[in-house]
Each structure stands twice: as C-alpha cells, then as structure tokens.
Amino acid sequence: MRSKFKDEHPFEKRKAEAERIRQKYADRIPVICEKVEKSDIATIDKKKYLVPADLTVGQFVYVIRKRIKLSPEKAIFIFVDEVLPPTAALMSSIYEEHKDEDGFLYITYSGENTFGDL
C-alpha cells in the first residue's frame, strides 16, 4: 500500500526527521500510522507517533483504538509490511525488523482482517 505520508514528504526530509527523533529520543520509535484506503473504519486524527520501545503491539493497538474512538465490539487489525504482527511483540523488535529505509516504522490499520482490495 502506498503511504500518503511518503507521498507528501520527500525521502530526504523524512530520513532527516527520523534521525533527529532517534538522536533526541533514543528510547522511542518513530511510527507513521495510516488507515488502509478502502477500509470503512474511522480515520485517525494524527499519523505520527513517538512510541516507547518497550510498548507491545497490543498496547499500541489500544492507543489507536482510543484515538479513533472505536467501540469495544468493533475489530481493528494493524499491519506492518502487509502482515499482522504478534500482539505480544515489542515495538522495538518490530521496528528493527521492519523499519523503512527513511527510519520510520510504517503501520496501517483496518477494520477487516484482509489486506488489499476489500
């Protein structure tokens, strides 16, 4: 999936920003979180997050649920490189495995457990 954030900001600017963030906040992970385009779930109010390295994927999902005011009975799925990451995984390990060449970790979310054409 194409990232709107990548489309709106040139690579050099993104890379410089991620490097600055990592230098200033070594214990935090720069994350870009965007909705899967064709999903009917609510759009998040901000894309950029600075998450603690020891946060789990499940805890991050909780943060996203709160930001989009998702009711408890509704499902949400997050994807990293089009794959559902393990809920218990630490954001730091997901970052090390999947960070983009610009230094950000790109996460997409959807109300459906499918990726691509819905």
Swiss-Prot record:
Lipid attachment points (Phosphatidylethanolamine amidated glycine): 116
Localization: Cytoplasmic vesicle, Autophagosome membrane; Vacuole membrane; Lipid droplet
Topological relation to the membrane, as annotated: Lipid-anchor
GO cellular component: autophagosome; autophagosome membrane; cytoplasm; cytoplasmic vesicle; fungal-type vacuole; lipid droplet; phagophore assembly site
Residue positions assigned to the propeptide: 117-118
Principal cellular location given in the protein's record: membrane
Keyword Transport carried by entry: yes
Name of this chain's protein: Autophagy-related protein 8
Organism: Aspergillus oryzae (strain ATCC 42149 / RIB 40) (Yellow koji mold)
Lineage per the UniProt record: Eukaryota, Fungi, Dikarya, Ascomycota, Pezizomycotina
